């Protein structure tokens, strides 16, 4: 490439994103517990909608996503005019950075927050500002102290990935109230459905003009392979985001499958209950053999080892047993492994394999 052809500032500072591994060399049918996927997959009703969609693949999809937006609004008690749909919640995050950040502005997030916050900030030439957490949990005072007149966006995953920790409504309200006037608080609720009774920021959005939530169909809805997400916020902000959203950013298949998925809340409830049961079981089983974790409110636990060497050695042992988990050194947690909560058999396999590893040490 010619030296005269250069990308925009910040682009070359982006490290390539590495997703969870899917395969282990020499191991057939390895169990993937590295990407926080729903082990039960999507709702049967969503699968039926997916199959029906093949009959209209020659037609362009809806440009306003009305069917999906209204379904989301009905289920969550929202105003459909203030819902925006995208290619995963990642795209909503990208829209927010494109619309409100840029050169000479700051995008704030916590030190163990989702990697896409930094990537999206750098992609628009903004300055990423990483704020320390307290014991792997969001520190509201630290975030407020990091805000300046340059701050435009504050991203907060609640529950957080990869830690699984979360803060309560009072802290969220204090954070929203304490931000500079020009800043937007973005509450990333990718794992919100795993928390009973949690509104993921809906009440705050109705009370204030500086809060937006993002959500995804990739986790509890089991549609990670389709890439569908959505956002909700003040109408003025959503109108801005729609101006940069591509008119056909979601296919008919994505829209119809996601609509069927969100309407099947019985499936969601079953998945949430099963996840909670086996998340508690696995955390307790690992704690008994000297592998602690913080209380997780998501569909994974962050297992802590004595040091990086032990975590990496355990990961290698798990791979020999056909178990794929996620190293999280990229999140500044090299002594930890993130383990997706699978079904009962999966959780028992993980506990047995880690116990086997600890006995060999």
From Swiss-Prot:
Keywords: Amino-acid biosynthesis, Aminotransferase, Histidine biosynthesis, Pyridoxal phosphate, Transferase. It catalyses: L-histidinol phosphate + 2-oxoglutarate = 3-(imidazol-4-yl)-2-oxopropyl phosphate + L-glutamate. Its EC number is 2.6.1.9. One of its GO terms (molecular function) is pyridoxal phosphate binding. Pfam families: Aminotran_1_2. CDD domains: AAT_like. The modification N6-(pyridoxal phosphate)lysine is found at residue 219. SUPFAM superfamilies: PLP-dependent transferases. One of its GO terms (biological process) is L-histidine biosynthetic process. Pathway: Amino-acid biosynthesis; L-histidine biosynthesis; L-histidine from 5-phospho-alpha-D-ribose 1-diphosphate: step 7/9. Its cofactor is pyridoxal 5'-phosphate. Homodimer. NCBIfam families: hisC (TIGR01141). Belongs to the class-II pyridoxal-phosphate-dependent aminotransferase family. Histidinol-phosphate aminotransferase subfamily. This is Histidinol-phosphate aminotransferase. It comes from Cereibacter sphaeroides (strain ATCC 17029 / ATH 2.4.9) (Rhodobacter sphaeroides). The lineage of its organism: Bacteria, Pseudomonadati, Pseudomonadota, Alphaproteobacteria, Rhodobacterales. The gene is hisC.
